[in-house]
Amino acid sequence: MKMAKENPECICATRVHKMTYTCGKLNPYKQWYHNFNKWRGNSSDLFFTSGAGTLIPARIMPQDIFNKEVFKDICFLADDVWLNFQARKKKIKVITNNFYNKDEISIGKTQRVKLVQQNVLVGGNDKQIDAVKNYLKFE
């Protein structure tokens, strides 16, 4: 909460990934720095995960985030992609800290069906990122 009070125009997230680029082009999701914890501050290159403690001030986000038909059509399995690129389009920065563990905890044998299979291992996040960027007319 302290981080949010000190940065009211930012999205505050405990768990983030750092997006990486090659020659100015966004690298595939698998090539990003995941569960990034070497940064304390805000950046436009931090990609918040929508779990693990994320505060998104509704007043700073575009109303288009509520366009459920488009969301369901182009990135139904990646709400974090939808929210992150909507925020990036509006130039909203993400702030994080470096003093909490960024790795999620899962209970053995409860994650047989999981989004990581579809979104990370099979490249679903990259497809959904491209679809959202195309929809938002994002470079």
Predicted regions, residues:
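Conserved catalytic core of nucleotide-sugar-dependent glycosyltransferases
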Residues: 1-69
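C-terminal catalytic/acceptor-binding lobe
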Residues: 59, 63, 68-139
